[in-house]
Amino acid sequence: TGHIIAAANAVIAPAADRMKASHDIAIDRKRSKGPPGGEMAALDPVAHGRVQVLDCPSGDVAQAMAAVDELVRLSRLDPEWSWSRAAIIARDWRRLTPARAYAESLGIPVEMANESMPSIWRLREMQQFIDALRRDTTRLLAIRDLVDVLNAIPSNRWTDLIAEGIAALAKELANKTMPVPDLVEWFAEWANDARSDQRSLLLLTAHRSKGVEFDDVVILNGGWDRPSKGEDPDAPRRLFYVAMTRARRSLAIIADGQHPFVQQGAEHVLRRAAPAIGADVALPTALYQVPDLKTVDLSWAGRLRTGHPSIASISAAKVGDPVHIVREGPTWMIQDAQGQALGRMAKSWSPPERLSFLRGEVGAIVRWRKSDNQEEYRVHLHRDVWEAIIPELVFG
């Protein structure tokens, strides 16, 4: 919007080493006929599309809560709101942890840009879906057939994700049919591409934000006033400018007193106090570890001999089932509610220091094969194909 561009240009103007020589960025011609506040000029009765500077008490937790609360406020103004078009940007990852915990506590879907999603193709649900398609490779299937196949699989967040894939294919296929081998290939490509799609409120650093845009952005305070080692004095200002220009529709900036870059008094900026946090609000301290293949010994179940009780327990396990982690020698085991081992964490994994294990659940179940392992390790494997449990863990 005009207001976001005016604020960003004012921030970058003092920088000695201009990113684009003497050319200020300008608004898209298609948008230039609209109000400088864009659609938020009419939608937001508080800021009217101006860039907000929210004055907030110091501390990572207070500002994280102010940032999330501001996005919640905006979400209530827009019936078309999607958390997948919103982001909170910080100078470093550490400041984003409380924002993650607070968003989770409010039930807001949230993801950190430095976390990787499990391989969609390897998910139990995806493999069941593909196995069902492959039962007869001579068929021509329509979208309704794919929906029927998916509906036969117990539903969870991963079947919801596959449903997104079917919806994407429906745009291409419409009322036509497609041969099974082509469908399998299409879903393999989609699974690879879909891993990088944003589906939730995204938390990321300014460095990571380069090249992506969001409708609504809040920038956290902290770390902007000093260059990192080896950086020139203008580097933080240029990085802050990058963060500001990620916002297409609305931009809020958290400050504690005078902001190092955003000056007061400009017509495109509204400075106001962030709403006070009530005394009854539980401050977020939880640390979330999302399902990540790198944290688990993926071949543990492949080393089990036929008849081992863990094999049946893994088959019976469902996404969302409670798990806990138990130390066993130098490693940590994943156990179900009955105390049966479901898997083992990677040797390189350990719980975060000074935090207690609060709860855990089966986050994902992936199919792994003997052929996925290097030749020298295959001698220890007693099965050709197995499932590995990938937990989601919460510490606090």
State where each predicted segment sits.
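Accessory/regulatory regions of helicases
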Residues: 51, 227-299
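Conserved coupling/interface region of RecA-like P-loop/ASCE motor cores
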Residues: 1-36
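Short, conserved phosphate/pyrophosphate- and ester-handling motifs at nucleotide-, phospho-/glycolipid
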Residues: 1, 211, 346
